[in-house]
Amino acid sequence: MADTERTFVMVKPDGVQRGLIGDIVSRFEDRGLKLVAGKFMQIDDELAREHYAEHVDKPFFDELKEFITSGPVFAMVWEGQDAVAQVRTMMGETDPAESAPGTIRGDFGLDLGRNVIHGSDTEPGSAEREIGLFFDDDELQDYERIDEPWLYE
């Protein structure tokens, strides 16, 4: 598969509690992305601070940390052509009220604080940093989907 990349995606506690993991995974698989890692986990305060380091000094950080540590999350790594951009498009805008119908947040998000999903941003190195926070190298699987020759030139 040429020009593939990996990206980090997390179903947040509100998405887990509402039983949306299967719907979200199906959307990415249907798009042709390949799941190369996934696990349920509980984020602790330290990981929340590392993951959201750019927000630590912002007024909303404590509320964000409280939410992201309030219940289990489903952390994933997806692979495919332009995976970061594809996932960001499929997620929709951060605020579900501004997300188009058909996007994950447009269909499932309730409000800015309960927007169901996180995905790596397009800043260089962002996806790699987040993948490294949540997964060890030996947790990432390399395999070929049987439909890859049909999906990619």
Swiss-Prot record:
Record-linked SUPFAM superfamilies? Nucleoside diphosphate kinase, NDK (SSF54919)
Catalytic reaction(s) noted? a 2'-deoxyribonucleoside 5'-diphosphate + ATP = a 2'-deoxyribonucleoside 5'-triphosphate + ADP; a ribonucleoside 5'-diphosphate + ATP = a ribonucleoside 5'-triphosphate + ADP
**InterPro entries per the UniProt record, alphabetical:** NDK-like_dom, NDK-like_dom_sf, Nucleoside_diP_kinase
| One of the GO BP terms on file | CTP biosynthetic process
Which Cys-Cys disulfides exist here? none
Name any one GO molecular function.
metal ion binding
- Cofactor(s) listed in the protein's UniProt record: Mg(2+)
Domain of life (superkingdom): Archaea
Q: Where in the cell is it found?
A: Cytoplasm
**Where would you say this protein principally sits, based on its record?**
cytoplasm
Per its UniProt entry, what is the enzyme's top EC class, as one word? Answer: transferase
Which CDD domains does the UniProt record give? Answer: NDPk_I
Which residues are listed for ATP binding in this entry? K12, F60, R88, T94, R105, N115
GO CC annotations on file: cytoplasm
Q: What positions does UniProt annotate as the active site of this protein?
A: H118
Provide the E.C. number(s) assigned to this enzyme: 2.7.4.6
Q: Does the keyword Phosphoprotein apply?
A: yes
> What NCBIfam families is this protein classified in?
PRK00668.1 (NF001908)
Quote the HAMAP family the UniProt record gives: NDP_kinase
Concerning its family, UniProt says:
Belongs to the NDK family.
Q: What does this protein do?
A: Major role in the synthesis of nucleoside triphosphates other than ATP. The ATP gamma phosphate is transferred to the NDP beta phosphate via a ping-pong mechanism, using a phosphorylated active-site intermediate.
Indicate what this protein is called per its UniProt record: Nucleoside diphosphate kinase
